[in-house]
Amino acid sequence: MKLDILGLKTLSVLKQAFEYIKDRHGVVLTMETIPLDDAPTYNIFLNKNTAGIFQMEESLMTEYASRCMPKSLIEISNVISLVRPGPLGIEGCLDGYAKSCSGESPADFPFPEYNYIFKETYGYLVYQEQLSRLSIDMCGFTGPESDELRKACAKKNRDALLSLRDKFIDGAVKKGHGRDDVANLFDSMEEFSRYSFCLAHKIVASVSND
């Protein structure tokens, strides 16, 4: 078992805020009862009022969140995960996601038959779990093989990732996909591996801090 434990003051601030709200307004709030569809909360990102919000205070993050106009917890998580070295290095990734998220352009993965894997990220590879699922469905990887690919990205192990290149491409070609198209996809994955998030980790962080 791997435990990722973060000692964040933000959690103490939230606890204190709950106590203040109860004392002053008689309203009892907990992490479990806070509504996740509260429009004024999402307007904070739209209006760039992100001072004091963990991971959202940087100017680039603030501007990008306002542009994407997140309307759900997963969309906040997507924004935080995209403004990272991996996605930032993929040409057109951030701009494309913002346009798809806001409805300006179609939300399509380069291989549309796998859109179901990328529905919540508007056609873009954002999380390690998506890569694992894609390697199984598109390339015929086994579960352990897909996890090997995920770990290569999680640990930023370029050599381990490249060792799976031929298997990834050959597996996709066997399912009828063009070799050059799949090779281009793998190249973008290599950039993605510079810094990518596990969805479970990111959602927990989003719930705790955002």
Write out the residue ranges for each language-model feature.
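Mg2+-dependent phosphoryl-transfer active-site scaffold
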Residues: 1-210
